[in-house]
């Protein structure tokens, strides 16, 4: 646990009692604060009381008298589409609002600098797609190289549940826009921006607000080194804003398709090979085609980001290459479930938006595509240029009929359920084809989350193998 510093003897309100909320309460208590907990759910409140915490109704009048800070869980809106009433009440009372990420940065190793021979460092990864894989890959590479490391944030443990800092340790955090948007302190040593595509726009008031939330990680006084994906306009802009000149090697530009040889430091992938260039010289080349856990151009971008971050931490190219080869990938992200009769079944349930689905569709030459769910703003019209590899689409969920109208002349069948979609795709697939779940939609019409959707797909596939 990371005890929260600087709030000793103060009352701190905690809103939202899921994993991060309860971890925050424990860390506040360990640091000497007095946490006051609230959640709209009676079950969550009862669980907190059962663990010995004080539950206080933060919706009542004058609830914030004497309260020094409100700490809120990332899923609770503080501005758009409308502030949560408790957060609005805190703001009206002049009480500052933070989250567990902000508390982590104000507390991690801050009183122990003289205890370390080699300072602990923090790497943060944000972006629309590839965050989890990049975070897990950095952690895996560091572990394989023998470096002490922990992983947390939007993946793994809550940040305040981490163990206290060790000498020379690297903490790798995946941060969503919900987490970066509200944190009052964001001071990573290395920050990674993978890419940007429309997502969570209702929570940020539009694309500009969404980008602004991600960009906070790179604010003045932020990272010593920035790793920026420049395959979209926002990444190009961010890299330019952070650089004093093209040769500035404090910014490492990465790409999964462009040559970036003219910059001070760059890492890019083309035709299956990763190349590192620094000050006009090629420093390394790695063949990514044989890496089983990193199929497709989108995973090559993840590999470039992880490689660049680990190079800034002092790892050698060959150390990184060996670790890339042993990376198994993450569940529900280009995950091979099995193969039968020359047909491969791939679970990419995490492809919940158009951009991530497009990258999944580019990874294989002949695809039986299972798509659908709860569609997002704009539908999937933007996927039309990427449908050349799709032999047939099998559409499920709430958006099935809308998707059928948006995929043009692509052969398709409305299946409604995962069970029928898997059965029909498996029945019609030919040797050399891939049955791919890449929904391009949220899961909430039929499943509680994308993980459960992916598990259902895998269960149906394994029954056929």
UniProtKB/Swiss-Prot annotation:
Its EC number is 6.3.2.9. InterPro entries: Mur-like_cat_sf, Mur_ligase_C, Mur_ligase_C_dom_sf, Mur_ligase_cen, MurD. GO terms for cellular component: cytoplasm. GO terms for molecular function: ATP binding; UDP-N-acetylmuramoylalanine-D-glutamate ligase activity. It is an enzyme of class 6 (ligase). PANTHER family: UDP-N-ACETYLMURAMOYLALANINE--D-GLUTAMATE LIGASE (PTHR43692:SF1). Belongs to the MurCDEF family. This is UDP-N-acetylmuramoylalanine--D-glutamate ligase. It comes from Cereibacter sphaeroides (strain KD131 / KCTC 12085) (Rhodobacter sphaeroides).
